[in-house]
C-alpha cells in the first residue's frame, strides 16, 4: 500500500516547506517564481510550471532541477531542525491505519529527505524506512512514481497495488498506472470530489473496511 503525505497523513500547511523551496529556487535559478498549484503533483512539476510562467525555457529549467532538489532538501532538513512544529496535525487515525498495513511505503511528490523528515517529526518514521516507496525529484510524473515504487517492492504487481490519497490527481495517477486507489477526504477535497476512486473514506479510520471491500 502506497500512502500520500500532504492532505493524507499530514494536514498542516508547512511554512518550512515553502521557505526552503523558495530560497532554493532563488539560489539555483536566480529568482523566485510561483505558478498554478496542482494538488497532488510532484515538487519538480510545480517548480517547472512556476518557472515556465516566469518565462524560463524548458532546457534551462531541466538543467537546474537536480541542483534545486538537493538545495531544497538540504534547506528543509536544516530549517526543520530549528523549527517548532508543535502545531503540526497528523491525520486522524493515521498511525493506527498505517501500522495495520503489513506492506506499506510512501508515494509522494515530496523529495525523499523532506518526506522522511516530516514522518520522523510526526512520529511515523519507523513505519516508513528508507529504500521503499517513490518520491518527488526521483520522477517528475506521479504516474511514473508508481512503477518505481513497485520495482522497489520486488516488482509488486500493479493490480494488487493500492494507493491512498486525498486529491483527484492521486486517484487518476494510480488508475493510469494500473493500480487502485482509496480516496480519503481529509484534505481540501470532499468525498464527492473523490468519487472516481475505488473506495472513498472520510478519514483513515475507515481504511481497513475499505480494503476489505476491495479484496476479492
Give each language-model segment a name:
Residues 29-38, 55-68, 126-130, 157-158:
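Short, surface-exposed acidic
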Residues 22, 45-60, 149-152:
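Helix-loop "lid/cap" segments that line or gate small-molecule binding pockets
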Residues 68, 107-109, 134, 138:
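Anionic, Ser/Thr-rich low-complexity intrinsically disordered regions
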Residues 18-22, 43-48, 69-73, 112, ...:
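An amphipathic alpha-helix signature
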Residues 2, 78-106:
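Short, acidic loop-to-helix structural element flanking the phosphoryl-transfer center
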Residues 1-39, 45-48:
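Active-site neighborhood of HAD-like aspartate-dependent phosphohydrolases
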Residues 71-80, 126-128:
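Short, basic/glycine-rich phosphate-binding loops at helix/coil junctions
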Residues 59, 95, 99, 116-216:
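Asp-based, Mg2+/Mn2+-dependent phosphohydrolase catalytic module
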Amino acid at each position: 500500500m502506497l500512502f500520500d503525505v500532504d492532505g493524507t497523513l499530514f494536514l498542516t500547511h508547512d511554512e518550512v516547506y515553502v521557505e526552503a523551496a523558495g530560497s532554493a529556487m532563488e539560489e539555483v535559478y536566480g529568482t523566485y517564481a510561483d505558478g498554478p498549484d496542482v494538488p497532488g503533483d510532484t515538487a519538480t512539476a510545480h517548480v517547472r510550471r512556476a518557472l515556465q510562467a516566469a518565462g524560463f525555457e524548458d532546457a534551462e529549467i531541466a538543467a537546474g532541477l537536480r541542483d534545486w532538489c538537493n538545495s531544497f532538501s538540504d534547506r528543509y532538513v536544516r530549517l526543520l531542525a530549528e523549527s517548532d512544529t508543535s502545531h503540526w496535525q497528523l491525520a486522524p487515525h493515521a498511525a493506527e491505519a498505517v501500522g495495520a498495513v503489513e506492506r506499506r511505503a510512501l508515494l509522494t511528490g515530496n523529495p525523499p529527505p523532506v518526506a522522511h523528515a516530516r514522518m520522523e517529526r510526526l512520529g511515523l518514521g519507523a513505519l516508513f524506512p528508507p529504500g521503499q516507496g517513490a518520491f518527488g525529484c526521483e520522477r517528475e510524473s506521479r504516474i511514473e512514481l508508481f512503477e518505481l515504487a513497485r520495482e522497489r517492492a520486488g516488482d509488486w504487481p500493479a493490480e494488487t497495488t493500492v494507493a491512498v490519497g486525498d486529491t483527484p490527481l492521486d486517484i487518476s495517477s494510480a488508475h493510469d498506472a494500473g493500480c487502485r486507489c482509496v480516496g480519503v477526504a481529509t484534505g481540501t477535497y470532499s468525498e464527492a470530489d473523490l468519487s472516481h476512486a475505488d473506495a472513498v473514506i472520510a478519514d483513515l479510520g475507515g481504511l481497513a473496511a475499505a480494503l476489505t471491500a476491495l479484496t476479492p
